[in-house]
Curated annotation (Swiss-Prot):
Fe cation 2 binds at residues 189, 242, 277, 280. It comes from Oryza sativa subsp. japonica (Rice). Pathway: Lipid metabolism; fatty acid metabolism. GO terms for biological process: fatty acid biosynthetic process; fatty acid metabolic process. Pfam families: FA_desaturase_2 (PF03405). Introduces a cis double bond in the acyl chain of an acyl-[acyl-carrier protein]. GO terms for molecular function: metal ion binding; stearoyl-[ACP] desaturase activity. Its main location: plastid. This is Acyl-[acyl-carrier-protein] desaturase 6, chloroplastic. The lineage of its organism: Eukaryota, Viridiplantae, Streptophyta, Embryophyta, Tracheophyta.
């Protein structure tokens, strides 16, 4: 998973479902729930301001209770049984996406290896790698660090999946298809941080001590998953993350490669990682498709909830030990560099909507499920409109970029346009 992978886009975070226009009473949607509101004119002089605030608090509390009840429903025996019944299907359709160890690439396949090149050949290859790396601009280097730091936080992601009900690896060596998938996926993901770390070390362009501290901080910070333990939401989240990571690494490969800045070694590394992520995306996308077939109403509501809140980036607590707004800087730099953009976010949503055939869902949907389906299908266009408006506001405001030092690259300055 890459840092730019789900920058979750502040624009997307502001989006909410449309009010229900079929009701005779005014309504609004909170957390995907319709709540009938009493217009301020009806309160008028009869109710004091404090009473209005108290009523609003009661409404919010009711919404939270309803949401909590819905989240608990995803952990009911009936819902978890859906995952248990999928075990033979996972064995047949998901586990084959893992490659045998002997057929899998390793970091030493992509970078200079003294065991293959010998001492002199290794040093010559490292010198060539450093020469090529010298042409990569600092803006892309910062984005690369963010991606690498996120990949290195794999322990956080594996522990999160192991907490998911009905699929977690409870003993650490369970023989279930779900548990074997999690361990196999983690083993393949482990190479991503390793190969990026090794490239960065050999290139000489990075202050590796500062980069390593960033990794340390991120793993130590952990990641709160919302909602916790729900397999429906966990697989939607991971499918999106894997797709976004593939896009981010693929974009980076193109930007630094022969048609970009001429660093063939880095392009090869990023392209290889991107191919892995696409394979992993296929697995999680298949799982969500299967859930939507087995339980369309709960499945589409889980998709809507995750997208409505914005797919939270796993590295939002990323830190350099100095700037409180580092995450915002990384998001903006990724947009500027083109490694991961709002347009990419929209394209990913559209891709998953097509893959999961969300628009075709009808049978078995409740009213809430239909609203969730419509929200998901309309979301990309909403984000694009908000992006256009945000751009117009930025042009009018005539904001200027600021120059900030980044300790990952020896405090060299990069120019960033913050929101």
């Amino acid at each position: 998973m890459a840092a730019t992978a789900t920058m979750a886009m502040p624009l997307a975070n502001r989006l909410r479902c449309k009010p229900n226009t079929n009701s005779s009473s005014p309504s609004r949607t909170l957390f995907g729930r319709r709540v009938t509101m009493i217009s301020s004119s009806r309160w008028g002089s009869a109710v004091s301001g404090s009473a209005i605030m108290s009523a609003a608090a009661d409404v919010a509390a009711a919404v939270r209770r309803e949401e909590d009840e819905e989240m608990r429903s995803y952990l009911s025996p009936e819902k978890l049984e859906v995952l248990t019944q999928m075990e033979p299907w996972v064995e047949e359709h998901v586990l084959p996406l893992l490659k045998p160890v002997e057929a899998a690439w390793q970091p030493s396949d992509l970078l200079p290896d003294p065991a293959v090149l010998g001492g002199e050949g290794f040093h010559a290859a490292c010198a060539e790698l450093r020469e090529r790396a010298a042409g990569v601009p600092d803006l892309l280097l910062v984005c690369l660090v963010a991606n690498m730091v996120t990949e290195e936080a794999l322990p956080t992601y594996q522990s999160s999946l192991n907490r998911v009900r009905a699929v977690g690896d409870l003993t650490g060596a369970d023989a279930t298809a779900w548990a074997r998938w999690i361990r196999g996926w983690s083993a393949e993901e482990n190479r991503h941080g390793d190969v990026l770390n090794r490239y960065m070390y050999l290139s000489g362009r990075f202050d590796m001590a500062e980069v390593e501290r960033a990794v340390h901080r991120l793993i130590r910070s952990g990641m709160a998953v919302d909602p916790p333990c729900s397999p429906y939401h966990a697989f939607v989240y991971t499918a999106f993350q894997e797709r976004a990571t593939a896009v981010a690494h693929g974009n980076t490969a193109r930007l630094v490669g022969a048609r970009g800045h001429g660093d063939a070694a880095l392009a090869r590394v990023c392209g290889t990682v991107a191919a892995d992520e696409k394979r992993h995306e296929a697995a999680y996308t298949r799982i969500v498709s299967r859930l939507l077939e087995a339980d369309p109403d709960a499945g589409v509501r889980a998709v809507a909830r995750m997208l409505r809140r914005g797919v939270a980036m796993p590295t939002s607590p990323i830190s350099d030990g100095r700037r409180d707004d580092l995450y915002a800087c990384v998001v903006s730099l990724a947009e500027q560099a083109g490694t991961y953009t709002v347009s990419d976010y929209c394209s990913i949503v559209e891709h998953l909507v097509r893959e999961w055939r969300v628009e075709e869902l009808a049978a078995g949907l409740s009213g809430e499920g239909r609203r969730a389906r419509d929200y998901v299908c309309e979301l990309p266009q909403k984000i694009r409109r908000m992006k256009e408006k945000a751009h117009e506001r930025a042009v009018k405001a005539q904001k200027k970029p600021i120059s900030i030092p980044i300790n990952w690259i020896f405090d060299r300055h990069v120019s960033v346009m913050l929101p």
